């Protein structure tokens, strides 16, 4: 009988406050009690999106899309990480760009995905809505800019003149676009003609930032230089719309990553910041025109007093022009490297700014601002969100006996989490933690550090009970408890294994003389010295054996009671990083930096199997309770589920974005927890769904085939390769259509071809029957032809062939429709034209879906015009002419209806205004107007 296993799926992911994408600030909602406050911040949390309340530090909501990793229908690849966020506040839309080039548009009110766009081949670097929120512009690492229509749900066109990643753009209405790239160029695009009309060298190296305020444009490069440009869109002179005005130096020598403007609505004072690729943000104030004029006048006067000529004065003023426009304001310095920033509010007394850091925190700053006081106070950090995540990598995790609490240890902090609510309930300061363990009862946690310290924490009192600073002379890499929890075993890089006992001692209460409290303390018992550094120690569940991994690539097994040597397990080529022993103490597994897992028997020390398990160092292995199945995690960012008896991989769990450092298994085996370098903590829960090994292997092979097929289509290889653009010559234009083959578009094309096969066969069968019937009616020879029986599918859905094909077309997303049509071979193009010809005879269907029919027909003809022109089939020519005539008639009728309806609406509006709108006019002005107006001529009535 085929063996089945229970499937593990991701039940939760937490611990990430802000990942690599930018942050978006939204003001406090009007539903709040006071309607004010620092508002909310939208941040990326790897593949998800978090919305935080800045004041309370609470997670308001989390936006997640798609199947959970590990699900039966989930793809065998890690989910794409969010790379850019952009919100349109008037429409409550949030556009999210991902590392695989996908763009999803969310509705912030309903927390659902409205639109999916897939046109880029690399990660999204920039997104921007237009003023109305009906168009979205995206930039990517593939050097292309795409303009998307949110109403039509399609990509309008692709601008592809840059040679490297897009780093900035600015859009004015529907006419102009300015873009910068890492190729060092700044380009001005005319969006009406889709052409680049100006190109300038922005910086000698890469250009990293762009921002525009009125006619002022600022760009940043790879060094401390910042360029100021003058923007004059109305200038018709060739190359005169964008001119360089000057250069100024910022304080930081690192590149400027982002520039953003903000204006005080009360006094029209404008500020901007430059986010540097370090721990600083520099803010600047833009001087008003009166200030600039006064400064120029004073400078000119001083230069004249020095005896300079008019030319020298003009040259000097031009060189220092940037100092007249900009005034350095304040510099914000964070403790951590800054990932992104955003202005929040500005008033006459302060500026407020929020930022996210590389250490998984959100910081909110207030910059005091006094007009009359040039020496403003330093920026103040008013809010911080850091409780729900750790600053550095989680190196060790453990689960309490009752499966309710989770301990995570990192450099500088130990956090205790509620597994059910995923909230941090305790935070302790500690050293550089390498290993931690819950004591029986779940109220005490023991922790080992890189400095050789042992620290014992009490969760109930939130205090540090005991610290042994000289527990070891080097890093404590591993610790374990005996099954009764009374003894502790620690292994260190000082080549010793130490045994500790827990004892209760009376401790003097601080501030008293004779009051004592019982406190649990650690007491050193014995020491086992070995020849090499110890990386891992593990006590068998029956307390019989102690397994120790050494730096010499071996694992030595001792009897725990007598400390006598029992077995030496050798065979790994690199040090063993993790050990675990099965529940029956009969099997031991070891994982190593050589990417292998070895399964050994503890009776004779024989190696049952050696598995090449991962693509990088395997950091941890854990048996499931009461089972020989086990989990492993690696630096290749994958968690794997194995059968230790059949030596087969049951599941590959892709979710983490980077190295997975630690694993912990619940005492009942109901869930597994993993932690990673990406700051995320993920809970993998056992489900009722069953896993069959053969099905998983087939699924993996299918995914590999699909990926290969998509790659061949994109690169132009294989029989079903991508066809060239309709322009056809192979010359790369600055603008092109938005096309990208995806698995969804391929499947949509296949569904359409199946519908065409079924529908056209039915249509041709009916046409043949009608011809035979007419011939029989004329000659009356033989028996009358039998009407063919309809297709069972059409009878079941009660539709005609053309209705069935039209329904299939309607079910394809608009953003995938053209890509689905591009998949069809030319034989199916002819069938599609036959379908259009049939629809022309069905006036009801034609007028109901005229826009869709026209769009598909025009695209098919444009895309296949060379093949169609070369056809010598007279029937095809007649068919196309017939379609042209019928379509023109239908479009003319629709145009007439539209004109009639527009005029009718205008008349209704006029009548409504006459009845409801009244204009109040001054009596004196009205009399004067009537007296000045010409008297109308009176015509007599002739009877």
From Swiss-Prot:
Assembly information from the UniProt record: Interacts with snoRNA U3. Interacts with MPP10. Component of the ribosomal small subunit (SSU) processome composed of at least 40 protein subunits and snoRNA U3.
Main localization, broad class: nucleus
Gene: DIP2
Family that this chain belongs to: Belongs to the WD repeat WDR3/UTP12 family.
Higher taxonomy: Eukaryota, Fungi, Dikarya, Ascomycota, Saccharomycotina
Cell location: Nucleus, Nucleolus
Protein's UniProt name: U3 small nucleolar RNA-associated protein 12
Species of provenance: Saccharomyces cerevisiae (strain ATCC 204508 / S288c) (Baker's yeast)
One annotated Gene Ontology cellular component of this protein: nucleolus
WD repeats: 77-107, 119-149, 161-190, 202-230, 389-418, 428-458, 471-501, 571-601, 613-643, 655-685
């Amino acid at each position: 009988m085929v063996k089945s296993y229970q499937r593990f799926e991701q039940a939760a992911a937490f611990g990430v406050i802000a990942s690599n994408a930018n942050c978006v600030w939204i003001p406090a909602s009007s539903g709040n009690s006071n309607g004010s406050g620092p508002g909310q911040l939208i941040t990326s949390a790897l593949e998800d999106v978090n919305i935080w309340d800045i004041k309370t530090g609470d997670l308001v909501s989390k936006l997640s899309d798609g199947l959970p990793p590990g699900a039966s229908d989930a793809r065998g690849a890690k989910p794409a990480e969010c790379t850019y966020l952009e919100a349109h506040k008037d429409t409550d839309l949030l556009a999210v760009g991902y590392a695989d080039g996908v763009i999803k548009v969310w509705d912030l009110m309903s927390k659902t995905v409205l639109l999916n766009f897939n046109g880029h081949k690399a990660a999204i670097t920039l997104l921007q809505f237009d003023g109305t929120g009906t168009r979205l512009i995206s930039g990517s690492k593939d050097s292309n800019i795409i303009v998307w229509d949110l109403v039509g749900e399609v990509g309008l066109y692709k601008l592809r003149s840059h040679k490297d990643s897009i780093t900035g753009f600015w859009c004015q209405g529907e006419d102009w676009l300015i873009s910068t790239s890492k190729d060092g160029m700044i380009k001005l695009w005319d969006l009406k003609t889709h052409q680049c009309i100006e190109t300038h060298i922005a910086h000698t190296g890469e250009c990293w930032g762009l921002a525009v305020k009125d006619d002022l444009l600022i760009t940043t490069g790879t060094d401390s230089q910042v360029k100021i440009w003058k923007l004059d869109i109305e200038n018709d002179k060739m190359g005169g719309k964008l001119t360089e005005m000057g250069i100024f130096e910022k304080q930081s020598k690192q590149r400027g990553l982002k520039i953003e403007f903000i204006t005080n609505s009360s006094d029209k004072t404008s500020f901007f910041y430059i986010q540097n690729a370090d721990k600083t943000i520099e803010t600047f104030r833009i001087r008003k025109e009166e200030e600039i004029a006064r400064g120029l006048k004073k400078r000119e006067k001083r230069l004249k007093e020095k005896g300079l000529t008019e030319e020298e004065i003009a040259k000097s003023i031009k060189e220092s022009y940037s100092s007249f426009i900009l005034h350095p304001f304040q510099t914000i310095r964070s403790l951590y490297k800054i990932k992104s920033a955003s202005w929040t509010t500005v008033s006459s007394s302060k500026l407020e700014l929020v930022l996210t850091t590389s250490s998984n925190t959100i910081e909110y700053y207030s910059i005091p601002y006094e007009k009359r006081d040039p020496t403003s106070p330093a920026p103040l950090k008013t809010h911080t969100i850091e409780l729900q995540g750790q600053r550095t990598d989680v190196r060790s995790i453990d689960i309490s006996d009752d499966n309710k609490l989770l301990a995570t240890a990192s450099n500088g902090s130990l956090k205790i989490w509620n597994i059910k609510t995923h909230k941090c309930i305790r935070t302790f300061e500690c050293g550089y933690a390498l290993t931690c363990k819950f004591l029986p009862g779940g109220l005490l946690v023991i922790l080992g550090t890189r400095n050789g310290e042992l620290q014992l924490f009490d969760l109930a009192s939130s205090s540090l009970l005991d610290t042994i600073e000289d527990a070891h002379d080097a890093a404590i890499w591993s610790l374990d408890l005996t099954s009764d929890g009374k003894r502790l075993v620690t292994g260190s890089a000082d080549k010793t294994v130490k045994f500790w006992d827990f004892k209760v001692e009376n401790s003097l209460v601080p501030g008293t003389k004779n009051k004592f409290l019982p406190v649990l303390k650690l007491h050193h018992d014995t020491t086992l010295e070995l020849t090499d550094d110890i990386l891992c120690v593990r006590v068998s569940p029956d307390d019989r054996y102690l397994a120790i991994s050494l730096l010499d690539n071996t694992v030595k097994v001792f009897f725990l009671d007598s400390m006598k040597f029992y077995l030496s397990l050798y065979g790994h080529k690199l040090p063993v990083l993790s050990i675990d022993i099965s529940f029956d103490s009969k099997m031991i597994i070891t994982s190593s930096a050589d990417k292998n897992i070895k399964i050994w028997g503890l009776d004779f020390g024989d190696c049952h199997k050696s598995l090449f398990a991962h693509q990088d160092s395997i950091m941890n292995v854990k048996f499931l309770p009461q089972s020989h199945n086990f989990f492993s995690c690696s630096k290749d960012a994958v968690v794997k589920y194995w059968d230790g008896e059949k030596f087969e991989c049951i599941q590959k769990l892709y979710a983490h974005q980077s190295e997975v450092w630690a694993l912990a298994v619940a005492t009942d085996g109901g869930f597994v927890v993993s932690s990673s370098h990406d700051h995320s903590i993920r809970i993998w829960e056992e489900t009722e769904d069953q896993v069959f090994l053969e099905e998983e292997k087939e699924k993996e092979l299918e995914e590999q085939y699909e990926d290969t097929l998509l790659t061949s289509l994109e690169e132009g290889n294989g029989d079903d390769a991508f066809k060239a653009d309709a322009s056809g010559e192979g010359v790369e234009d600055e603008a092109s259509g938005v096309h990208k083959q995806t698995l969804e578009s391929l499947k949509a094309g296949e569904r359409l071809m199946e519908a065409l096969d079924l529908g056209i066969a039915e249509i041709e069968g009916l046409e043949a029957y009608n011809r035979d019937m007419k011939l029989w009616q004329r000659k009356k020879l033989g028996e009358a032809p039998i009407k063919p029986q309809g297709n069972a599918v059409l009878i079941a859905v009660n539709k005609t062939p053309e209705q069935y094909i039209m329904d299939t077309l309607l079910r394809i997303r608009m953003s995938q429709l053209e890509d689905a049509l591009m998949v069809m071979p030319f034989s199916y193009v002819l069938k599609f034209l036959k379908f259009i010809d049939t629809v022309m005879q069905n006036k009801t269907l034609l007028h109901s879906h005229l826009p869709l029919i026209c769009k598909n027909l025009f695209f098919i003809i444009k895309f296949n015009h060379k093949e169609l022109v070369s056809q010598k089939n007279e029937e095809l020519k007649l068919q196309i002419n017939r379609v042209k005539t019928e379509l023109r008639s239908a479009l003319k009728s629709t145009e007439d209806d539209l004109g009639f309806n527009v005029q009718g609406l205008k008349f209704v509006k006029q009548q409504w205004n006459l009845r409801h709108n009244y204009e109040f006019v001054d009596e004196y002005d009205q009399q004067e107007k009537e007296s000045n107006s010409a008297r109308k001529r009176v015509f007599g009535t002739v009877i």
